[in-house]
Each structure stands twice: as C-alpha cells, then as structure tokens.
Amino acid sequence: MLKQIKSDIYHLLHPKMAFFLTSVSKNDKPNVMTCAWATPVSEEPPVVIVCVSKESYTAELIKQTKEFVINIPTKKLLGALWICGKISGRDTDKFKRAGLKIIKAKKVKSPVIDGCVGHIECKVWKTVDAGECYAFFGNVISAYADEKYMRNGLWTKEAEIPLHLGGARIVYFR
C-alpha cells in the first residue's frame, strides 16, 4: 500500500551526496557549509545546481561573489560535515572549528578543502528564487578528483562517499 507523503517530500529523492559547499566574502573571508542538495543539469556546457536556504550566510556570500565550490569528502571527514552543518559561519570560523585545511582553488576565489576527493569550481550563471531556498546554477569552471578514488569517471568503493538519507542519517557509498 502506498502512503501519502505530505511533508519532507524531498526525502523521496534521497540519498544524496553530502558535501562541503565553500564560498568567500567580498573581502576574501572563506566560508563552508554542509549541503546535500546539488545535481548536474547540463553536460554541455557543464552546469550544476545547488540549493541553499535564503537565510544562510552561504547564500548571502554566493549572491555577492557569484561563485562556489562543491568539495566531495569521504567518511573520514564525517565529523567535520556534522560541525559545518550545525553552526553558522557568520560569527564562527567553521574551518578552524572543524579542523579543515584550506587550499587555493584553481579558477575561483572560493576555497577548496584539503582531504576531499573531488572538487567542482563554479561561477554562478543564474539564481532562481525556489521557495525557502535560492537555486544557484553554476557554470563548471574546473572539476577534478583524486584518481585513487575515481576511475573511468566513476567513484570506487574505497571512496566511501557520505550519502545523506535525511535528518541525522548518513550512509556511505560503497
């Protein structure tokens, strides 16, 4: 028997990859948040979309600077994922709090997170008002992955990519 879903409809589309979304302020102050709402929307040209709460500091920064980076972690960074998903970067240095090290990105000012196995650097092409979120369409400027964990365009089982099930539940891609 099928049950009517009235709230949390997005759970029907989970699991989703959990990742770090990095951004930067106009005066080059880096920021990071945990996110799971992203998807590719075009292969040619390569475009991804991330959806971020309008109330978040991250949304404010992305609207200002028109760029972001998707950083794909392994389960080794699970503790940092939880920290970066529970506090705001407005008044807290989440990188320091979560023990994350910043690396300079290849093509954008938003930082890359050391220890992640993949990175997608984006420039915002379009922003759409999407309910309580902004949907940021990002032109992919640069994308790269650790060849130890990605072969022939696919993640290996050793990558153990965290997948968000909804709420406080995470499983690992194997």
Set out the residue ranges of the language-model regions:
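Basic, polyanion-binding surface patches
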Residues: 1-174
